Amino acid sequence: MPHMIVEYVFDPPATEEELDAMAERLDPCLEGRDVRFVQSFVSLDRRRRICVFDAADADVVRTAYRSANVTFERVWPAELISADD
């Protein structure tokens, strides 16, 4: 399944409680659409976040986020390029 990248920008910076609340709302919406969380990166200043999901396409992820009322900057498909390649 392809990787989908979700970008966020937080102003003011996101708190741990806010990130947890987003995940609680989002998880059921992702599961119902066959979207699997892979990993997440949060900037040290807590103003940016990138999440990686396995999903059929970007529209499925966007729909899940909108259903959960979780804002995002953009969603785009990606492929992994690693040092092992």
Q: At which residue positions do the language-model features occur?
A:
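Short S/T/G/P-rich N-terminal loop/turn motif that feeds into the first structured element of a domain
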Residues: 1-32, 36-38, 43-47, 80-85
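Basic side chains
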Residues: 48-49, 74
